Amino acid sequence: MSAVVQQQGDLLLNLYIQPKASRDQIVGLHGDELKVAITAPPIDGKANAHLSKYLAKAFKVPKSDVYIIKGELGRHKQIRIVTPKLIPPEVSELLE
Protein backbone atom coordinates (compact mmCIF):
# COMPACT_ATOMS: atom_id res chain seq x y z
CA MET A 1 0.00 0.00 0.00
CA SER A 2 1.28 3.47 -0.79
CA ALA A 3 1.75 6.33 1.66
CA VAL A 4 -1.15 8.41 0.29
CA VAL A 5 -4.36 7.09 -1.28
CA GLN A 6 -7.37 9.06 -2.46
CA GLN A 7 -10.72 7.36 -1.78
CA GLN A 8 -13.98 8.99 -2.89
CA GLY A 9 -12.84 12.51 -2.04
CA ASP A 10 -11.13 11.51 1.22
CA LEU A 11 -7.41 10.97 1.77
CA LEU A 12 -6.00 7.89 3.46
CA LEU A 13 -2.51 8.53 4.86
CA ASN A 14 -0.10 5.88 6.12
CA LEU A 15 2.14 7.77 8.50
CA TYR A 16 5.28 7.25 10.52
CA ILE A 17 5.26 9.69 13.44
CA GLN A 18 8.36 11.23 15.01
CA PRO A 19 7.30 12.72 18.37
CA LYS A 20 9.31 15.31 20.35
CA ALA A 21 10.71 16.88 17.17
CA SER A 22 12.02 20.44 17.06
CA ARG A 23 9.11 21.54 14.84
CA ASP A 24 5.95 20.25 13.20
CA GLN A 25 6.46 19.26 9.58
CA ILE A 26 5.69 16.71 6.90
CA VAL A 27 9.19 15.31 6.32
CA GLY A 28 8.67 13.07 3.28
CA LEU A 29 8.70 9.37 2.50
CA HIS A 30 9.92 6.90 5.13
CA GLY A 31 9.79 3.51 3.41
CA ASP A 32 6.19 3.15 2.22
CA GLU A 33 4.88 5.67 4.76
CA LEU A 34 4.81 9.44 5.00
CA LYS A 35 6.96 10.71 7.87
CA VAL A 36 5.48 13.47 10.01
CA ALA A 37 7.48 15.14 12.78
CA ILE A 38 5.54 16.70 15.67
CA THR A 39 6.69 18.57 18.75
CA ALA A 40 4.37 16.84 21.24
CA PRO A 41 5.65 13.99 23.43
CA PRO A 42 4.03 10.54 23.13
CA ILE A 43 2.44 10.75 26.59
CA ASP A 44 -1.26 10.46 27.53
CA GLY A 45 -2.50 10.92 23.97
CA LYS A 46 -0.81 14.33 23.58
CA ALA A 47 0.93 13.29 20.37
CA ASN A 48 -2.31 12.04 18.79
CA ALA A 49 -4.18 15.22 19.73
CA HIS A 50 -1.34 17.37 18.42
CA LEU A 51 -1.10 15.32 15.22
CA SER A 52 -4.84 15.69 14.57
CA LYS A 53 -4.63 19.44 15.13
CA TYR A 54 -1.57 19.78 12.88
CA LEU A 55 -3.09 17.71 10.06
CA ALA A 56 -6.42 19.58 10.32
CA LYS A 57 -4.54 22.86 9.89
CA ALA A 58 -2.37 21.53 7.03
CA PHE A 59 -5.36 20.15 5.08
CA LYS A 60 -7.73 23.02 6.03
CA VAL A 61 -10.37 20.77 7.63
CA PRO A 62 -11.96 20.75 11.11
CA LYS A 63 -10.27 18.44 13.65
CA SER A 64 -13.44 16.34 13.63
CA ASP A 65 -12.64 15.37 10.00
CA VAL A 66 -9.28 13.81 10.92
CA TYR A 67 -9.67 10.17 12.01
CA ILE A 68 -6.99 7.84 13.37
CA ILE A 69 -8.04 4.51 11.87
CA LYS A 70 -5.09 2.39 12.98
CA GLY A 71 -2.11 2.90 15.26
CA GLU A 72 -3.62 4.82 18.16
CA LEU A 73 -0.74 3.74 20.43
CA GLY A 74 2.14 3.38 17.97
CA ARG A 75 4.29 5.42 15.62
CA HIS A 76 2.80 3.77 12.54
CA LYS A 77 -0.65 5.24 11.93
CA GLN A 78 -3.34 5.19 9.29
CA ILE A 79 -5.26 8.46 9.10
CA ARG A 80 -8.39 9.39 7.13
CA ILE A 81 -8.91 13.04 6.22
CA VAL A 82 -12.46 13.75 5.08
CA THR A 83 -12.69 15.95 1.95
CA PRO A 84 -9.52 18.02 2.41
CA LYS A 85 -9.80 21.64 1.25
CA LEU A 86 -6.04 21.86 0.62
CA ILE A 87 -3.43 19.21 -0.08
CA PRO A 88 0.11 20.18 0.99
CA PRO A 89 2.70 19.89 -1.82
CA GLU A 90 4.61 17.16 0.07
CA VAL A 91 1.45 15.04 -0.06
CA SER A 92 0.12 15.95 -3.52
CA GLU A 93 3.33 14.79 -5.20
CA LEU A 94 2.75 11.32 -3.70
CA LEU A 95 -0.83 10.95 -4.95
CA GLU A 96 -1.25 8.19 -7.50
From Swiss-Prot:
GO terms for cellular component: cytoplasm. SUPFAM superfamilies: YggU-like. It holds the Pfam family DUF167. InterPro entries: DUF167, YggU-like_sf. Belongs to the UPF0235 family. NCBIfam families: DUF167 family protein, PRK05090.1. This is UPF0235 protein Sputw3181_1321. It comes from Shewanella sp. (strain W3-18-1).
